[in-house]
Amino acid sequence: KARGRIAESINANDDEIFFTSGGTESNNWVLKGVAFAAKKEDKNKNHIITTKIEHKSILNSCKWLEDNAGFTTTYLDVDKDGFVNPEDVRKAITSKTILVSIIHGNNEVGTIQDIEAIGKICKESKVLFHTDVCQSYSKSELDVKKQNIDLMTLNAHKIHGPKGIGALYVKRDTRIMDWQQGGSHEKGMRSGTENVHGIVGFGEAVKIAKNDFKKNNKYISELRDKLIKGIMENVENVKLNGPDIKENGNKRLSNNVNFSFSAIEGESLGGYLDQKWVCSSTGSACNARTLEPSYVLKAMGLTDEEANGSLRLTLSKFNTEEEIDYVIKILPKIVEKLRYISPIGKVVNYFKKDKKE
């Protein structure tokens, strides 16, 4: 039943859904499974196309294939809002290309790519197209047939399901090697005892998300827009990272807010917010322990200072308008305090002239 619900949610067939431990495993399986299947058939087929702002599980899998199996990768640039130009995909495809892998909704800045246009280009070029929809699942309309998608990565916990369970959609007749050898689990493609309780929870989460899709996204988008507007109006020298909500609100994930604050570090800002019971992040959850500037923001053209001053706030249907008001109330005071004690803030003088130092 869970397999059927997931398949129905993306307009796929039940037998095209394979359960995994999550998005990272699904992404690894796609890259390596497609790569080795292609190489087995034709040794000259060794080229992969992706972008500079993909999830680490894609970028690191590409690097592994480069270092250990003789594959090459083209990493496409993105614009200042994180969009990849579909025509850049077309230009990058060669006779050796086996796969194009582009994330649908970016996990840091919320940019939603035009996967339908990219999928059409891949279909015309007879190249497999994979997209990671972990962030956009339940927040955007997905249709593997309409959007010409051959492989799709999904997971449960981003839609309030259990952790440790994900899925991979593989279009019928797509050449991909089995991921684990052993028994006959998952039609012999991914051996190992299935996470039954996780699968059931995944299916239930899909059911709930489908029933409340429009209502939840409208509500969360309104919270997002209020938070963005409130911060922009009450904090000086702040930059919204990702698509502008006025021009491209429908091309930004409904739950994503990402700002860069001049003259302070996002890490410090996040620490103060944590003391006020506000959860935040300075980048992707998978990269949160590193002190390096976000590679996603750097790829979008931000300076090290701008990237280090970034803060991400992620919303859900469980957030309230009162919580948004609370963040808008406390954040400006925290930013002002951090700028006051920051050496950078003193040098560039971000304070109004009539304020006392």
Task: List the model feature ranges, each with a label.
Residues K1-E357:
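Pyridoxal 5′-phosphate
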